[in-house]
Swiss-Prot record:
Encoding gene (name): murQ
Keyword field contains Metal-binding: no
Keyword Kinase (UniProt): no
Quaternary structure annotation from Swiss-Prot or TrEMBL: Homodimer.
GO biological process: amino sugar catabolic process; N-acetylmuramic acid catabolic process; peptidoglycan turnover
UniProt domain SIS: residue ranges: 57-220
Listed EC numbers: 4.2.1.126
Keywords, in A-Z order: Carbohydrate metabolism, Lyase
Family, per entry: Belongs to the GCKR-like family. MurNAc-6-P etherase subfamily.
Classification via InterPro entries: Etherase_MurQ (IPR005488), Glucokinase_regulatory_CS (IPR005486), MURQ/GCKR (IPR040190), SIS_dom (IPR001347), SIS_dom_sf (IPR046348)
Annotated Gene3D superfamilies: 1.10.8.1080, Glucose-6-phosphate isomerase like protein, domain 1 (3.40.50.10490)
Full protein name: N-acetylmuramic acid 6-phosphate etherase
Active-site feature positions: 85, 116
Lineage: Bacteria, Pseudomonadati, Planctomycetota, Planctomycetia, Pirellulales
Length: 302
């Protein structure tokens, strides 16, 4: 175990922070920020693999497949976080993007001792959510050696699911199990081995790209507007009203009335206004173009 850890980039000592305990608060903050500035460049080296993954995920979404994140500790929490943001942002069903964490929901708020050390637990957890050959499994392990994640990837391969590995160590144990391997090398952490820092930031950046990219590819935005937003609070209600008002050129009051007619669906409301059809017809028109509003609006009205 010790020899394995010594070989991991994420476990190495960072020379830049060797004397960090003698620095002032301002110097500590500046040093952390300087190190964080390296993360985006590391993620950018993986752009082609991330883009390939985006297209695979979008294809699975189109055939009613799911995106499943699997991880332990920080990696698992980040997967659950990204998955939980998809329903309000893109009006997706909760089961379309799912985060699975070693130790279950309790592990979101506290460490569950030994949860990540059992590969067989991953098979059990994935079987519970009925992982299928139509799904994509993203195994997240910044170290690249977490038994729980390795077990999950092996199980996913055995049933024919598409596998993607995400690690911050280059030649890791996830690689031979992953059809696409994403490995941004962020280097040693400010606090040695504390992968909630740079590695965690890189992980969150990649997950943002995977879900956002795939959702854009399946028509969940209009330009850069989140027209499939589910308005679950006052902020999102106001955003929906403003978005509709700006896109179709009507007042805020008119936008509010139109949204009420369309059950709060911005995309439907846009079609109703521009194409002069009923909400029911607008929804069917969107289905006919696989939800791509820009494609629909480019079609002349009959």
């Amino acid at each position: 175990m010790l020899n394995q850890l010594n070989q991991l980039t994420t476990e190495a000592s960072n020379p830049a922070s060797a004397q960090i305990d003698s620095l002032s608060a301002l110097q500590i903050v500046q040093l952390i920020n300087q190190q964080d500035a390296l993360v985006a460049a590391a993620v950018n080296t993986q752009a082609e693999m991330i883009a390939e993954a985006v297209d695979v995920i979008a294809d699975r979404f189109r055939s009613n497949g799911r995106l499943i994140y699997l991880g332990a500790g920080t990696s698992g929490r980040l997967g659950v976080l990204d998955a939980s943001e998809c329903p309000p942002t893109f009006r997706t069903p909760p089961e379309m993007v799912v985060g699975v964490i070693a130790g279950g929901p309790e592990a979101l708020t506290r460490a569950i001792e030994g949860a990540e050390d059992h590969p067989e637990f991953a098979e059990r957890d994935l079987a519970k959510i009925n992982l299928s050959s139509n799904d994509v499994l993203v195994g997240i392990a910044t170290s690249g050696r977490t038994p729980y994640v390795i077990g999950g990837l092996k199980y996913a391969r055995s049933i024919g699911a598409f596998t993607i590995g995400l690690s911050c160590n280059p030649n890791c144990q996830l690689r031979p199990l992953s059809q696409i391997m994403i490995a941004p090398i962020v280097g040693p952490e400010i606090v040695s081995g504390s992968t909630r820092m740079k590695a965690g930031t890189a992980t969150k950046m990649v997950l943002n790209m995977l879900t956002t990219g795939a959702m854009i590819r399946i028509g969940k935005t209009y330009g850069n507007r989140m027209v499939d937003v589910r308005a679950t609070n006052e902020k999102l209600v106001a955003r929906s009203r403003q978005m509709l008002s700006e896109i179709v050129g009507i007042s805020g009051d008119q936008a509010e009335q139109l949204l009420q007619q369309c059950d709060g669906e911005v995309k439907t409301a846009i079609v109703v206004h521009i194409k002069e059809v009923s909400p029911q017809t607008a929804r069917q028109m969107l289905v006919d173009v696989d939800g791509h509003l820009s494609r629909l609006l480019a079609t002349p009205s009959e």
